[in-house]
Amino acid sequence: MAGRYAPSPSGDLHFGNLRTALLAWVFARHDGRDFLMRVEDIDEQRSTMESAERQLSDLSMLGLDWDGDVLYQSSRHDAYRAAIAQLDTYECYCSRRDIQEASRAPHAKPGMYPGTCRELTPGQRAERRAGLAAQNRHPAIRLRAEVDSFTVVDRLRGEVTGDVDDFILLRGGQEPGWAYNLAVVVDDAFQGVDQVVRGDDLLDSVARQAYLCTLLGAAIPEYVHVPLVLNARGQRLAKRDGAVTLREMLVDAPLTHIISSLAASLGYEGISTPVELLAVFDPGALSLEPFIFTGLNGSATDRMDK
């Protein structure tokens, strides 16, 4: 049994990222699971090894330990290719504009691929493939889904039913890249991850990922979608909101104060280490409302419901 944290190395981790990492760690340790670390660096244009090293250093500094070696998605291309070979897929030649225009059609579901390329003839595929090649572009690869919805059980939210469409497994364009939905499912199965704690902004993708688990013969993990950290304007916290990364906060506050603020955002006062939080952590007491971050000197209990 294992939980995991899987940051994308595109910059330093901010207060919201650190809070989710702490929750992933404390859920896993509370339940007696191993805690694994994975670097989701398949987006080569945004990912850097420097960012990965800084993130891992920050998490270690915070007091989060993990079991085994760090897994880098950039080393997993063969596994993703093997997974696609097991699935019923087809090439998609649509541009983003094509999909946006199709979504405006009557009865179209927002955010759902309408299946434009699903039933093309071999001749139509050859013609469209040649058209993309002339632009030095590659088609995307989509899953040929046999369901339009899927239900999972989230530990905090109960049954969650989400839409499933013919979602992308391999992005097209001039530089093809593996899609998050494919990589995360393949890697969770490979690592034996049976608990996924992450931000609730990813709740919309859980049905697709759980359905993909069934197609690949992988067990569906326990999902725990935790609330995000928002800024004072009610928007998702971002690095542009000021001194919110660990290294920035350490300029003005000791590490114990930062950990105390993280724990207080979860409803626990007087905590100065993750181990202290683990000793008193109650998964059932976790608020489902977003936390409003107003700085380390702001109220540690500001939530949308107060």
Curated annotation (Swiss-Prot):
Short sequence motif named 'HIGH' region, residue ranges: 7-17
Pfam family, one: tRNA-synt_1c
Residues binding ATP: 239
Cofactor note: Binds 1 zinc ion per subunit.
One annotated GO biological process: glutamyl-tRNA aminoacylation
Known cofactor(s): Zn(2+)
EC number: 6.1.1.-
GO cellular component entries: cytosol
UniProt KW keywords: Aminoacyl-tRNA synthetase, ATP-binding, Ligase, Metal-binding, Nucleotide-binding, Zinc
UniProt cross-references to HAMAP family, sorted A to Z: Glu_Q_tRNA_synth
Cited PANTHER family: GLUTAMATE--TRNA LIGASE, GLUTAMYL-Q TRNA(ASP) SYNTHETASE
Family: Belongs to the class-I aminoacyl-tRNA synthetase family. GluQ subfamily.
Name of the protein: Glutamyl-Q tRNA(Asp) synthetase
Organism: Corynebacterium efficiens (strain DSM 44549 / YS-314 / AJ 12310 / JCM 11189 / NBRC 100395)
